[in-house]
């Protein structure tokens, strides 16, 4: 009997009584290691174990020898502090580019998590550097929360408060506290959480609004979908609130935090996931009516595993069972974006039939974690095959073996298309987190 062990309980996660399905998920594969008992085309248990360990080896090598060193070397702005706001596909640094809040928060999260797992002092140095710059330049001392962008010398540029951006600062500060025990970082995460609950929450219809002025007055500025003025709520923001609130609850298990995590998780389940297609609904009006018809495959598969991660923290066996079942349905829906070459497409507009065939780095990374999660839940090796094929595609097309790091976009034929390697959205968080999820899950 072969035991493939997945470690789903992080070393410093909440100490709770185990639900019916332990948080330490054991994927038991009962296979007799004889030719007669193996189905044609199926791997033996030993083959699966070898595959998983090889996957972990290759991904951890890329993480530790390529991805994290690349971001450590090229991104720090040694003149003005913080991190450069843009690096293009030819490795050209743009020192005058504005510095994005999401980019800086994601860098803080990535190196905090890396230090927590690997205990490498160089990662702590990067995390400290990121945290100090954020505290000094992004946090708004007068009105609270964090600016959306600052200029190259750290002065406020876009002072609007964007719920999505604020969620990443919660996520990053909570992870930094988890890695270092720095109380001020936890205080910062809690303060931003309370500001969102005060200003961003729709107290009548539930859910969270998108954009605010610096002093937290509601704004109808369109940041995520400039073509739909009816949008007031988005899948992306609610997904990353699930992620951020789960991260904060893990280190701050107060009753109010538990209630708000449960609320946003249930919102995602009941309002964001389409109960007929099991795709996530991209944009919605205030009353939760869809305003667009877009299937975003990467967000589907990312959401599929993040909702399970959140449910596991809530110590509710019935909820976890329901969420795991839903996660598999979402994962199956996201298969519509998978191509024969192992890649995942970006999205499809159902109103026009237009498919965005360009491949983005983050969807490929989330595909690995999402289908590994589905494999853990079900033991169905077809999900493991998807994760393996995603990694093969990444190795062949996304890893930059010349300059380091990953390309951010490749064409349908797998060629880099010249997109920035770092900017407001492009960061080490999706692929870095994928690497750390694989390292922690596969034991």
Task: Set out the residue ranges of the language-model regions.
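Bacterial Sec-dependent N-terminal signal peptides
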Residues: 1-47
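Glycan-recognition and catalytic cores of secretory/periplasmic carbohydrate-active enzymes
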Residues: 42-443
């Amino acid at each position: 009997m072969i035991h493939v062990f997945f470690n789903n309980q992080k070393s410093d996660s909440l100490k709770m009584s185990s639900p019916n399905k332990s948080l330490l998920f054991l994927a038991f594969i009962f296979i007799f290691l004889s030719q007669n008992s193996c189905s044609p085309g199926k791997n033996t248990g030993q083959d699966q174990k070898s595959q998983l360990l090889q996957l972990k080896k290759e991904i951890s090598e890329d993480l530790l020898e390529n991805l994290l060193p690349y971001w450590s070397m090229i991104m720090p702005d040694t003149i003005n502090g913080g991190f450069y706001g843009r690096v293009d596909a030819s490795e050209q640094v743009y020192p005058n580019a504005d510095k994005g809040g999401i980019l800086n928060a994601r860098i803080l999260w990535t190196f905090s998590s890396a230090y927590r797992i690997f205990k490498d002092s160089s990662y702590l140095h990067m995390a400290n550097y990121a945290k100090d710059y954020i505290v000094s330049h992004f946090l708004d001392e007068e009105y609270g929360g964090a600016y959306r962008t600052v200029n190259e010398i750290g002065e406020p540029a876009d002072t609007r408060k964007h719920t999505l951006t604020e969620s990443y600062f919660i996520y990053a500060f909570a992870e930094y506290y988890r890695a270092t025990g720095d109380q001020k970082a936890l205080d910062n995460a809690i303060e931003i959480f309370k500001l969102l609950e005060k200003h961003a929450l729709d107290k009548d219809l539930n859910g969270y609004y998108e954009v605010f002025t610096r002093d937290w007055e509601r704004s109808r500025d369109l940041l995520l979908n400039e073509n739909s003025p009816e949008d007031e709520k988005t899948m992306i923001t609610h997904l990353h609130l699930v992620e951020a609130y789960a991260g904060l609850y893990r280190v701050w298990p107060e009753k109010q935090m538990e209630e708000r995590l449960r609320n946003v998780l249930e919102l995602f389940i009941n309002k964001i996931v389409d109960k007929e297609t099991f795709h996530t609904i991209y944009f919605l009006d205030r009353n939760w009516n869809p305003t667009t018809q877009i299937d975003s495959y990467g967000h589907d598969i990312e959401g599929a595993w993040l909702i399970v991660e959140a449910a596991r923290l809530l110590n509710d066996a019935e909820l976890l069972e329901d969420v795991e079942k839903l996660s598999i349905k979402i994962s199956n829906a996201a298969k519509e974006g998978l191509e024969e070459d192992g890649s995942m497409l970006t999205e499809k507009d159902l109103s026009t039939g237009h498919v965005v065939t360009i491949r983005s780095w983050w969807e490929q990374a989330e595909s690995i974690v999402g289908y590994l999660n589905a494999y853990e839940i079900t033991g169905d090796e077809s999900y493991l095959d998807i994760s393996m094929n995603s990694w093969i595609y990444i190795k062949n097309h996304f890893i930059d073996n010349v300059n380091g790091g990953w390309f951010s976009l490749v064409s349908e034929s797998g060629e880099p298309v010249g997109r920035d390697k770092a900017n407001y959205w492009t960061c080490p968080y999706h692929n870095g987190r994928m690497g750390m999820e694989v390292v922690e899950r596969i034991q």
